[in-house]
Amino acid sequence: MKKNHFDIIVIGSGPAGEAAAMNAKKKGRSVAVICDLEQVGGSCTHLGTIPSKALRHSVKQVMQFNDNPMFRDLGDARKLSFQQILRHADRVVYEQVKMRSDFYERNQIPIFKGRASFLDKKTIKLIGKHKKLTANHFVIATGSRPYHPPGVDFSHPRVFDSDTILNLSH
């Protein structure tokens, strides 16, 4: 088999791309993944779901701790800066990336960094790189974006979506 030819190439390393790649590999297929971010995991890991949920969970824990009479009797309420809480979310993202990277490495699935562009029905190139890959089949799992309902001003400084909530500074 040629070095840059695979049974299946998965474009995207988020949850759907990861599942497709792992399932194909478990069925004995040669698989490669194209990832347009510096690290695997897609927007779910880096922008939206995981970091925003980690942030929300951390804030809820601090609030519950400070509201719990058992802990209140121990002294003053715990004060954590927003930056400390954001660092926790960053740590969660780091752990997710490491775990997902280990999945790919353990299953011997190569990751190619870059954005894919089809040259024909069996060939893609990595944009900005001199790399072409071929496959018998492709899975396009490029993810989604936050929904912005009409009538909500997302340019307002106090309105955030799951991709921008981590840009808060306080």
Model-derived features with residue positions:
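Beta1/beta-strand and adjacent pyrophosphate-binding region of the FAD-binding site
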Residues: 2-14
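Glycine-rich flavin
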Residues: 3-6, 22-29, 35-170
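N-terminal Rossmann-fold NAD(P) dinucleotide-binding loop
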Residues: 17-18
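The conserved SAM/SAH-binding core of class I Rossmann-like methyltransferase domains
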Residues: 11, 34-35
